A protein has these predicted regions:
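The first (N-terminal) embedded transmembrane alpha-helix
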Residues: 9-30
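Membrane-helix interface motif
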Residues: 24-36, 65-68
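Alpha-helix boundary/interfacial micro-motifs
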Residues: 10, 35-37, 72
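Alpha-helical transmembrane segments of integral membrane proteins
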Residues: 39-143
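Cytosolic juxtamembrane helix and N-cap/initiation of the first transmembrane helix
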Residues: 1-16, 43-46
Length: 143
């Protein structure tokens, strides 16, 4: 993996983690008062916050792995490939869970029809990822 690509992956993951934190804050600001008043499903609200936490920290871990992979001359190519593969997996987990959050929010505020469409699209995305991610992830160093 080239240094430029590793640096790009660091920036991409960092930006998505920051976006995830902003979405988390937005949800707390607008949905927490409804949660306190009992106007939304507490299980769904908390599940959404957990999903955003998993997404955020997965993206942060991806950023750290990509950053370590970008350190030229300090690590071997085998270790760089391993760090990049781990970063790819953390990034995919964070991105996938972050895409689940909108449907959870929509279910939380009782917009069931719209939430169902979002969930169906997320499931299509999940099937697409299961099928194609193994083909596009960073290859092992020995290959």
């Amino acid at each position: 993996m080239g240094e430029d690509l590793a640096a790009t992956n660091v920036n991409r993951s960092y930006a998505l983690a920051a976006t995830s934190i902003a979405i988390f804050t937005f949800m707390l600001f607008f949905l927490y008062p409804r949660f306190e008043n009992g106007r939304i499903d507490p299980w769904l609200f908390q599940s959404t916050l957990v999903a955003m936490g998993v997404a955020t920290f997965s993206l942060v871990f991806a950023t750290l792995h990509y950053y370590r992979a970008s350190l030229a001359g300090r690590i071997s190519e085998d270790e760089r490939a391993l760090l990049t593969r781990r970063g790819d997996r953390f990034w995919l987990l964070g991105y996938t869970v972050m895409f689940l959050a909108p449907s959870l929010v929509l279910f939380t505020v009782s917009l069931v029809a719209v939430a169902s469409v979002w969930l169906a699209l997320w499931l299509v995305y999940l099937l697409f990822v299961i099928r194609y991610f193994p083909k596009v992830q960073t290859p092992r160093a020995s290959q």
